[in-house]
A protein has these predicted regions:
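Sec-dependent N-terminal signal peptides
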Residues: 4-16
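Divalent cation-coordinating acidic motifs and surrounding scaffolds
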Residues: 18-135
Length: 135
């Protein structure tokens, strides 16, 4: 009986203290202009989080390449990361951007495909980017 109680106690408090850490960061024009030193700084800053969302990823190829470089840098730090990048928002050329999700694959699992919510594209310049994760 004592062993069962101890096991229950351990499982209860282990699950009670499980946390998922989320970070959201507007990196302002995150693209090819970011140096390797800046990418390393960003990776060192976000690496203790489980899910990272980035706003203002440059809409062109430089933005997708910068997110890929960040994911590579995070993967070199010993934990496996994956990422998804949105299509460009439907804003005017000067306001269009992308978003990105990065996550630790051992902490959370992406469910389905992330999407830009088109419902609001006439009311707002940059529609939100949604994703569902399983913890």
């Amino acid at each position: 009986m004592n062993k069962i109680f101890c096991l229950f106690f351990l499982l209860f408090f282990t699950s009670f203290y499980c946390q998922t850490k989320l970070l959201s960061w507007n990196l302002e024009n995150f693209g090819k202009s970011k140096s390797n030193q800046e990418i390393t700084f960003i990776a060192n800053t976000v690496r203790d989080f489980d899910i990272v969302t980035i706003q203002e990823v440059v809409a062109g190829n430089g933005g997708t390449q910068a997110v890929a470089k960040l994911a590579d840098e995070l993967n070199r730090k010993g934990t496996k990361w994956d990422y998804r990048i949105s299509e460009p928002t439907s804003s005017s050329a000067y306001k269009t951007e992308r978003y990105a999700f990065l996550w630790k694959t051992n902490a959370v699992k992406l469910k389905g495909k992330p999407w830009l919510e088109q419902q609001y594209h006439l009311e707002i310049d940059r529609e939100p980017y949604f994703a569902t994760f399983e913890i």
